[in-house]
UniProtKB/Swiss-Prot annotation:
Family affiliation: Belongs to the SdhE FAD assembly factor family.
Keywords (A to Z) from UniProt: Chaperone, Cytoplasm
InterPro entries per the UniProt record, alphabetical: SDH (IPR005631), SDH_sf (IPR036714), SdhE_FAD_assembly_factor (IPR050531)
Known function: An FAD assembly protein, which accelerates covalent attachment of the cofactor into other proteins. Plays an essential role in the assembly of succinate dehydrogenase (SDH, respiratory complex II), an enzyme complex that is a component of both the tricarboxylic acid cycle and the electron transport chain, and which couples the oxidation of succinate to fumarate with the reduction of ubiquinone (coenzyme Q) to ubiquinol. Required for flavinylation (covalent attachment of FAD) of the flavoprotein subunit SdhA of SDH and other flavinylated proteins as well.
One GO cellular component, as annotated: cytoplasm
The organism's place on the tree of life at top rank: Bacteria
Presence of the UniProt keyword Chaperone in the record: yes
Biological process according to GO: succinate metabolic process
Name of the gene: sdhE
Name of the featured protein: FAD assembly factor SdhE
Compartment(s) of residence: Cytoplasm
Keyword S-adenosyl-L-methionine in record: no
Length: 95
């Protein structure tokens, strides 16, 4: 039997990765949860691996910082000021 290298699976081809991403998306603030849940309901099946990487970066933020970005009170800065994060953030803001 051959070992399968799961690191080569994309987000779309691996349901476990999708489940982990949804689990990481759970937030402490209801407002963030609502926005993120709507986002997943609309875009989950269309997410690229770059989108998943950007979401992962956003989900590492404290809840209040994420809410400020989602509500456009602030714009991404530093390591978050990259096209992939800005793209995902625009999708999150649109839902």
């Amino acid at each position: 039997m051959t070992a399968v290298n799961t690191s080569t699976f994309s987000h779309q081809s691996d349901p476990h990765r999708r489940a982990r991403l949804r689990w990481r998306a759970r937030r402490g603030l209801l407002e963030n949860d609502i926005i993120v849940e709507r986002f997943f309901n609309r875009y989950e099946t269309e997410l690229s691996d770059d989108d998943v990487g950007a979401l992962t970066q956003l989900f590492e933020l404290p809840d209040n910082d994420l809410m400020d970005l989602l509500l456009a009170r602030k714009e991404p800065e530093g390591a978050l000021d990259v096209p992939s994060v800005r793209h995902v953030l625009s999708l999150l803001r649109a839902v």
